[in-house]
Amino acid sequence: MIDLTIKCKEKVPSRAFVVGYPIHHSKSPKIHNFWLKQYGLQGEYLAQEVKLEEFSDFLTSTKKRGFCGGNVTLPYKQEAFRLANYKDEVATMIGAANTLWYEGDKLCATNSDAYGFSANLDDSAPNWVGETALIFGAGGAARAILYALKKRGFERICLLNRTRQRADNLAEHFGKPVEVHDWHNVGEILYEADLIVNTTSVGMTDPHGWKTGSLFCDFQKTKTTTLVTDIVYTPLTTPFLQQAKAHGLRTVDGLGMLLHQAVPGFERWFGITPQVTKALRTKILEDMGEERG
């Protein structure tokens, strides 16, 4: 398990933020405010919509604004990493930051996406173990997944991406056991994979991508014990997961990763380790239903 739960060294105001542009889509305020209410804390967690040209000034002035830290969402994760005074190993390997906090006047950064991914697997598929993983995609999300799987001790991590060069770059950055494969031998890897992860937006932006070629995955070639997960959570059960289920495979949706990645930040800012519960999941699902409705 990746340990991102070290608390700030000093007592800081219980006021945190999530910053992005746009920000209205973010579920973070509902997650953190749910926990604040659940644990009877008097803190605040506020959404901050900041334009690109204003982001640097915003981030460097957050302590003066009374914030003890916050989350960073699209499109600023890489810029937040660059601006932070201290970056831990996780953020450095992933090359992006989504969780910030202060130690004195020093702005510190980590990335909790890898933690969220691992915790979601442990929560949704307890006692599951594997040695070989197949990952679709080589974007920012894939970097977090690669870090998580290396930390979990996977012996083989196979990477497939439409643009091979991006996958090659990631394999060079992370080193063994990451290896890049071409689409023509995906069938062989499918049979060997204990875990299949979709880190692309296919299923959200291209509902039929799994069968038209943008993300083709023949689940008939997998082992019956293979676990399949998709980091996309809108829709909750993506076409990718639907097909895996249709072939009797165990699946894990992406909502749990979103919920679990929020845990380390909340603990840093408010001093309590929150629990990802069925009640929280239900609350966020209700909110998603309201937005779709």
Swiss-Prot record:
Q: Which domain of life is it from?
A: Bacteria
Q: Which UniProt keywords apply?
A: Amino-acid biosynthesis, Aromatic amino acid biosynthesis, NADP, Oxidoreductase
| GO biological process entries | amino acid biosynthetic process; aromatic amino acid family biosynthetic process; chorismate biosynthetic process; shikimate metabolic process
Enzyme Commission number, as recorded: 1.1.1.25
Record GO cellular component, one term: cytosol
The UniProt entry, under InterPro entries, shows: Aminoacid_DH-like_N_sf (IPR046346), NAD(P)-bd_dom_sf (IPR036291), SDH_C (IPR041121), Shikimate_DH (IPR011342), Shikimate_DH-bd_N (IPR013708), Shikimate_DH_fam (IPR022893), Shikm_DH/Glu-tRNA_Rdtase (IPR006151)
- Keyword Amino-acid biosynthesis assigned to the entry: answer is yes
Give a GO molecular function annotation for the protein: shikimate 3-dehydrogenase (NADP+) activity
User: Which residue spans traverse the membrane?
Assistant: none
Task: Identify the residues that bind shikimate.
Answer: 26-28, 73, 98, 113, 233
Catalysed reaction(s) here are:
shikimate + NADP(+) = 3-dehydroshikimate + NADPH + H(+)
Quaternary structure annotation from Swiss-Prot or TrEMBL? Homodimer.
Q: State the PANTHER family in the record.
A: BIFUNCTIONAL 3-DEHYDROQUINATE DEHYDRATASE_SHIKIMATE DEHYDROGENASE, CHLOROPLASTIC (PTHR21089:SF1), SHIKIMATE DEHYDROGENASE (PTHR21089)
Q: Which family does it belong to?
A: Belongs to the shikimate dehydrogenase family.
Protein name, please? Shikimate dehydrogenase (NADP(+))
